[in-house]
Amino acid sequence: MALHFSKEEFKSRKSNILNSMKEQNIDALLMFRQESMYWLTGYDTFGYVFFQTLVLDQKGNLILLTRAPDLRQAQNTSNINDIRIWVDKDGSNPTDDLKIILDELNLKGKKIGIEYEAYGLTGRNAIKLNQSLENYCSIEDKSELITKLRVVKSDEEITYVRKAANLADLALEEVWKYAKSGASEAKILAEMNLSLIHI
């Protein structure tokens, strides 16, 4: 598992989310934003344009619902232990699979926060989700819950930001050697990347 932060860092993030959920009287949070999933678990995928959600309930249960093509990515980049697959085929409705998870977590009649502002939650999927949860639970838009928590950086995050800034400075120094009239952007980008590989 290629996690970029310590177990303690991820534990602290989860605790902060749970505290925020408790303050807002949210029994569970459905994360659809890739950046939220990454921040909480390390899960990194290009599959964020498809329906996938990370469910976190007040008890700390964490379940990812995703497509089969993203299974290995979830296993190899995150600390998520419970990964469920929905079958991506004509006529399938992943919100049916999600509802099974919500039933397992005893969330019927509870209050669920949803990250509606997300690339993977298209208008059509949001409509399906709302229809699926109608008369099942109460829902609220909680698109900013994790975003607000991410604003305050931890010591580990500040260390990464400083390292990233130093790397950006090194790459910029390299750019000036090649940036001139008529220069190929591909060549400039290649030299920038090459300079970072040799560090």
Predicted regions and their residues:
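Active-site pocket-lining segments that scaffold enzyme catalytic pockets across diverse folds
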Residues: A165-V175, E185
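Short, charged, surface-exposed loops that flank catalytic or proteolytic processing sites
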Residues: K180-I188
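Conserved small/polar residues in nucleotide/adenosyl-binding loops
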Residues: I197-I199
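Non-catalytic accessory segments adjacent to catalytic cores
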Residues: S92-T147
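Terminal domain-start leader segments
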Residues: M1-N61, E173
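Structural motif
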Residues: F32-Q34, T66-A68, I114-Y119
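Compact, glycine/acidic-enriched structural inserts
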Residues: L65-K89
